[in-house]
Amino acid sequence: MASTQLTRTATSGTNTKATFSAWVKKADANEQFLFYHFGSSANNFRIRFDPDTIGVQTLSSSSSVMHLNTSAKFRDPSAWYHIVVAIDSTQATDTNRAKIYVNGVQQTSLSATTYPPQNQNMHFNESATVYIGGQAGSNYFNG
């Protein structure tokens, strides 16, 4: 079981546009965080396996302003997955504000579909700790 993660402290920058990309291979079926930006318990951004779907969520003032979960299941322990999350909350159309791609295919069948409001601060580039492969000492990515 994994018990380590990478951390860095983000600096100020845009909080409305970003692209996250990772190649991952799961070793088990538990909930695991790929990326977690912990601005505070009230303001954070995360990308995770939940446990076999891919979820992306932003909390702002303790309310979920974005929550997307794929309907497709990703549970093959021998498969590599290329995951891309593209966010641009400045877009006029809500479904263009956040997109999840797996192995080059946009995931349009979603079990959770709360898109961010236009120009929403997504809390992913604030001066706070960014965790890659975990969530503040827990939910490590095991892969």
Where are these regions (language model features)?
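Extracellular glycan-interaction patches encoded by glycine-rich segments
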Residues: H123-G143
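Short, aromatic/His-centered strand-loop micro-motif at the edge of beta-sheets
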Residues: Q57-H82
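Beta-strand signatures of extracellular beta-sandwich domains
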Residues: G55, K99-Y101
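Short, solvent-exposed loop/turn segments that connect beta-strands within catalytic domains
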Residues: S61-V65, T90-N96
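Short tryptophan-centered beta-strand motifs in secreted/extracellular beta-sheet-rich domains
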Residues: A22, S78-S89, I100
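Surface-exposed loop/edge segments in extracytoplasmic proteins
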Residues: N43-F45, S63-N69, Q106-S111
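Extracellular glycan-recognition modules
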Residues: A2-Q57, Q91-D94
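Short, solvent-exposed beta-strand-to-loop segments that form ligand-recognition rims
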Residues: V102-A128
